[in-house]
């Protein structure tokens, strides 16, 4: 029977998780190639690309190792013992990934205006800097700057890999072991193919068009991740209320908390039987058939926060200051400098780095974010 050879839910699970990972990785690789395209940047470009692939490889290795133990436990105990914490770490990882992607998207849009400066920054990020002797916060900041292209693919692959393993483990008991290899291979292959097409398209398009399109895609993914993260945390609370995994009841009554529900449809679930096409919408856009107040509000608040952030950046580039934030910060700094014993810190606080001063003097004609 076809069911004994090819498990359709497994295919959609692998395809869904691989598509989201491929989008992030392809955008990063295209960004590196577009930004460091000159011959003199070949060494820096290779090292940054190596960081991306190391992040993918290590994230995949860790998720496979953890997944092997989890799948073994699924078959050994005949029960999903990890469902009680699945939604918790799903929510945490989704929120972290959303914040990282949001920051990365804003940085991408500034490349066309400050492309040469970005080349210098990327090169400086790879310089050997001492990570000892300073405070833990400074050391952590230096480490994050040096391995920025490693962190995002690492977290993304780790999160998507563990998510795929948990979902596969949840449906594995209804399929024989022979039904796993082919759908896993074809699902990953299809996801990689989509990522490759995005990468090729990003390289052939002009830099400005590529940055606009890729940033829009990244923010759609980040908004969906933020909403999904809140939804997972709420679902984790509901699982504790009912004393089990709500997903095991399907998509009908009992699978959601009606007190927190904004809408619910018994079809179109991204979690039941691999999700099918709805699982793809869930991975890229954050679709859910059972929306809660938290997931809907968080999705809208995310976009409001992003809009306010971009308007503030636009205003600061044009006028060199923020109307409310900068006076408040100056007042706080003034109070701090008035305290006894802070004389040496006054110079340090009031000193503005030269690169920030240069940015604030950019002509208004080139002040657009793109």
Curated annotation (Swiss-Prot):
InterPro entries: FTR1/Fip1/EfeU. It is a multi-pass membrane protein. GO terms for molecular function: ferrous iron transmembrane transporter activity; high-affinity ferrous iron transmembrane transporter activity. It holds the Pfam family FTR1. Disruption phenotype: Does not affect the virulence in a murine model of invasive aspergillosis. Displays an 8-fold increase in external siderophore triacetylfusarinine C (TAFC) production after 12h of growth in iron-depleted conditions. Residues 351-360 have a biased composition (Polar residues). One of its GO terms (cellular component) is high-affinity iron permease complex. Induction: Expression is up-regulated during iron starvation and is controlled by the GATA-type transcription factor sreA and the Zinc cluster transcription factor acuM. GO terms for biological process: cellular response to iron ion starvation; iron ion transmembrane transport; reductive iron assimilation. The chain crosses the membrane at residues 5-25, 52-72, 88-108, 148-168, 179-199, 206-226, 293-313. The keyword Cell membrane applies. Residues 335-370 are annotated as: Disordered. Keywords: Cell membrane, Ion transport, Iron, Iron transport, Membrane, Transmembrane, Transmembrane helix, Transport. It is found in: Cell membrane. Belongs to the oxidase-dependent Fe transporter (OFeT) (TC 9.A.10.1) family. High affinity iron permease; part of the reductive iron assimilatory system (RIA), a siderophore-independent high affinity iron uptake mechanism. This is High affinity iron permease ftrA. The lineage of its organism: Eukaryota, Fungi, Dikarya, Ascomycota, Pezizomycotina. The gene is ftrA.
